[in-house]
A protein has these predicted regions:
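Conserved mixed alpha/beta catalytic, RNA-binding, or beta-rich assembly cores of soluble enzyme
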Residues: 36-46, 62, 67-129
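N-terminal interaction modules that seed assembly of large macromolecular complexes
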Residues: 2-72
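Alpha-helical oligomerization segments
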Residues: 130-172
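Short, tandemly repeated low-complexity microdomains enriched for cysteine and small residues
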Residues: 27-31, 111-114, 136
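Charged, low-complexity interaction regions
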Residues: 24-26, 107-108, 148
């Protein structure tokens, strides 16, 4: 699953709305935007860290002249060295940070829900909002059936169609 910056506002709104509606947290209506902003800040900080890891990975690969097919392995090593969780672990980290924030936030009046139940609910919201990259890849490849993978023309078209699919889904 991948978190896109464009999904953050809707996701933060859904998290606060769902937990408030279920009675897990109490938030004054006038303070709701600030509570949502706290959640947005957590997700945006995660994306900033992710961006730093990707940039450092690219620099290392360029310095050592490593091919792009090793990107995932090198990124994992860089992320581990920085203590930055990736993939589903990253989502679990974000959820943990959100729950910790509820306990200290001046915009959340009261927390009644159990951590485990709220964690499960928030993870469900993330699954609903986040996009599986494999689904995007399948959709793009289905549109490029008439081209042979691996050619330069296919690579160019793949990137163009991927951008169109992401734009269509509101991810960019």
């Amino acid at each position: 699953m991948r978190l896109y910056r464009s999904q953050i506002p809707r996701l933060a709104e859904d998290i606060i709305g769902t937990l408030a509606l279920s009675g897990d947290i109490v938030v004054e209506v006038s303070l709701r935007p600030e509570a949502e902003q706290d959640i947005r800040a957590i997700m945006e900080e995660y994306l900033r860290q992710e961006h730093r890891v990707v940039q450092e990975t690219r620099e290392i690969m360029e310095q050592r002249q490593i091919t792009y097919d090793q990107f995932g392995r090198i990124k994992g090593q860089v992320a581990d060295s920085k203590g930055h969780p990736t993939g589903d672990d990253g989502i679990r980290w974000i959820v943990g940070q959100i729950l910790e924030n509820f306990m200290i936030s001046k915009y959340i009046d009261e927390v009644f829900g159990e951590d485990r139940a709220m964690r499960r609910g928030i993870m469900g919201l993330f699954r609903k909002h986040l996009v599986e990259e494999a689904d995007l890849d399948r959709e793009v490849r289905s549109r490029l059936k008439n081209m042979r993978p691996g050619t330069s023309k296919w690579d160019i078209e793949y990137r163009r169609v991927m951008e169109d699919v992401r734009r269509k889904r509101g991810l960019i």
